[in-house]
């Protein structure tokens, strides 16, 4: 099983790893796209006012421009440790034992806007760029990434993909049709039986799910296998629309 996660806007600063290496991350075929987007971000950062406008930064966020300017030289840390926010706080990868972290490294990709999907343990620098940003110097991010990411995922050829990304990041790299995939929607059930999508708790539930998977390290190779594991783990999951699963929180 391969799990696809969205990134987070908030990130830990610093790191102790070597600087960014476009071809040293998971899916190395994406190195040209990674380099193009990173170079465009660095070029944009030469004009702080323009960068703040494009990245929609407020006065207290302008330090993010300098973060982007240093992308090629900045220290790195594992992607799963770099990101903070609701999903990654619930996952709390730093507190996992080594075997669970290795499981994350083997089974989880985090889909970023500047680097595309990267392995959970891949070293990445801090950055500021969202999926919907129109970045000068390169085509729309969807044009940069979608076809290339789909091809790279196809080359990896996982037996089953559990897609926990937001729809904005799905658009930057749809899973190829030939790969069995389930897109997960987090929902709740009201007392009247109505099922409603969740927002804030959506992220928490996804992070907690991945932590549970990393703790137990199951061998899952199909949607049916995932549903069986979830049922045994006391989680409520059901097939909904074609290609989708509902996770009840």
Which ranges hold each PLM region?
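A glycine-rich, hydrophobic loop/mini-helix early in the fold
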Residues: 52-126
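Generic signal for short, ordered secondary-structure residues
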Residues: 16, 67-70, 90, 188, ...
């Amino acid at each position: 099983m391969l799990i696809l996660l969205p990134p987070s806007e908030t990130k830990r600063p610093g790191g102790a790893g070597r600087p960014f290496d476009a071809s040293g991350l998971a899916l190395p075929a994406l190195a040209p796209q990674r380099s193009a987007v990173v170079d465009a971000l660095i070029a944009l950062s030469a004009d702080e006012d323009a960068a703040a406008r494009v990245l929609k930064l407020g006065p207290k966020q302008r330090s993010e421009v300098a973060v982007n300017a240093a992308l090629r030289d900045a220290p790195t840390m594992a992607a799963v440790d770099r990101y903070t926010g609701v999903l990654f706080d619930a996952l709390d990868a730093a507190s996992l034992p080594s075997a669970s972290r290795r499981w994350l490294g083997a089974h989880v990709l985090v889909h970023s806007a500047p680097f595309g999907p990267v392995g959970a343990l891949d070293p990445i620098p801090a950055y500021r760029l969202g999926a919907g940003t129109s970045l000068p110097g390169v085509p729309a991010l969807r044009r940069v990434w979608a076809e290339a990411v789909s091809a790279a995922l196809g080359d990896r050829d996982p037996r089953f993909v559990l897609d926990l990304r937001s729809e904005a990041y799905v658009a930057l790299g749809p899973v190829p049709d030939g790969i069995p995939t389930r897109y997960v929607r987090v929902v709740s059930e009201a007392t009247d039986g109505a099922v409603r999508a969740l927002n804030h708790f959506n992220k928490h539930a996804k992070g907690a799910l991945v932590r549970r998977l990393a703790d137990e390290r199951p061998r899952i190779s199909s949607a049916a296998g995932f549903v069986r594991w979830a049922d045994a783990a006391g989680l409520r999951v059901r097939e909904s629309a074609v290609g989708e699963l509902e996770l009840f929180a």
